[in-house]
Curated annotation (Swiss-Prot):
Residues 1-26 form the signal peptide. This is Autoinducer 2-binding protein LsrB. Keywords: Periplasm, Signal. The lineage of its organism: Bacteria, Pseudomonadati, Pseudomonadota, Gammaproteobacteria, Enterobacterales. It comes from the Bacteria. GO terms for cellular component: ATP-binding cassette (ABC) transporter complex; outer membrane-bounded periplasmic space.
Length: 340
């Protein structure tokens, strides 16, 4: 009888140790995927995501393709799902190209969120959104209008690709605003750098050479904007208004030299943090619905908005958009206050 009891105790002890080990292994893991690695904007977002992970006791992995491709992102998504990750947060290179992989992941219980660039809303739970297309499109035009003060002007648009979700939405709104509020502005070309620094510089120089009387380049892309600024310096075009979106650390020398008077962005480190906090809430508690809020340390309250804020026609429970609290216009007076 005593021997039987000892065996039972040993079995229970072993079971307890195994359960404890399983509990340790069951700590949540979140994958944070950019459009591509090696770009300061995305690295900063990844830093914010990993900082939030440390604060929450969550393992956050930052990884992305070396080139912005649907196939590269799909491969990463599938790999993370097969490795047992609990949530995936992705900046999508295509609104629909990732959807089959993301829907399969959701069917396996993986929580899916997007940040920076969205998919179709039915392919994720929440989009951590830097601003609505109307907000960001208006911001682009207003920055250009601060410098182009003549009624008739020639404007070029220059960004990453014709298929990327976010930038095309902003540009669509920007062009609509130009048509309505600046009918004398002629949009002479729309070109793409495909998230490649060398190609972006070549494309920017090509635009400036092809349109010697160009008044402004609007470049809402982290590679395109510094490329446009460098091209203007290389070709000694000092009278060209260059505006768009990029990080302050990348753009600081161009602002200090006066090549770029102002440009915009949002706190992408904050965007990474918010993404992980929302994913953590989704993993630990009930899904948030439109109107629900979450308090994030050091940031404040964020609220779930309907997908219609982004122009979508899809709404569902546990699905929506989380807008960043603010956007920033950087210039020589404030750029040194930021480090990302």
């Amino acid at each position: 009888m005593a021997r039987h009891s000892i065996k039972m105790i040993a079995l229970l002890t072993a079971f307890g140790l195994a359960s404890a080990a399983m509990t340790v292994q069951a700590a949540e893991r979140i994958a944070f995927i950019p459009k591509l690695v090696g770009v300061g904007f995305f690295t900063s977002g990844g830093n914010g995501a990993q900082e939030a992970g440390k604060a929450l006791g969550i393992d956050v992995t930052y990884d992305g393709p070396t080139e912005p491709s649907v196939s590269g992102q799909v491969q990463l998504v599938n790999n993370f799902v097969n490795q047992g990750y609990d949530a995936i947060i992705v900046s999508a290179v295509s609104p629909d190209g990732l959807c089959p992989a993301l829907k399969r992941a959701m069917q396996r219980g993986v929580k899916i969120l997007t940040w920076d660039s969205d998919t179709k809303p039915e392919c994720r739970s929440y989009y951590i959104n830097q601003g609505t297309p109307k907000q960001l499109g208006s911001m682009l035009v207003e920055m250009a209008a601060h410098q182009v003060d003549k009624e008739k002007a020639k404007v070029a648009f220059f960004y990453s690709s014709p298929t990327v979700t976010d930038q095309n939405q902003w540009v669509k709104e920007a062009k609509a605003k130009i048509s309505k509020e600046h009918p004398g502005w002629e949009i002479v070309t729309t070109q793409f750098g495909y998230n490649d620094a060398t190609k972006s510089l070549q494309t920017a120089e090509g635009i400036i050479k092809a349109y010697p009387d160009l008044d402004a380049i609007i470049a809402p892309d982290a590679n395109a904007l510094p490329a446009a600024a460098q091209a203007a310096e290389n070709l000694k075009r000092n009278n060209l208004a260059i505006v768009g979106f990029s990080t302050p650390n990348v753009m600081r020398p161009y602002v200090q030299r006066g090549t770029v008077k102002e440009f915009g962005l949002w706190d992408v480190v904050q965007q990474g943090k918010i993404s992980v906090y929302v994913a953590n809430e989704l993993l630990k508690n009930m899904p948030m619905n439109v109107g629900d809020s979450l308090d994030i340390p050091g940031i404040g309250k964020v609220t779930v908005s309907p997908n219609s804020e982004q122009g979508y026609h899809y709404e569902a429970k546990g699905n929506g958009i989380v807008l960043l609290p603010e956007r920033v216009i950087f210039n020589k007076d404030n750029i040194d206050k930021y480090d990302f």
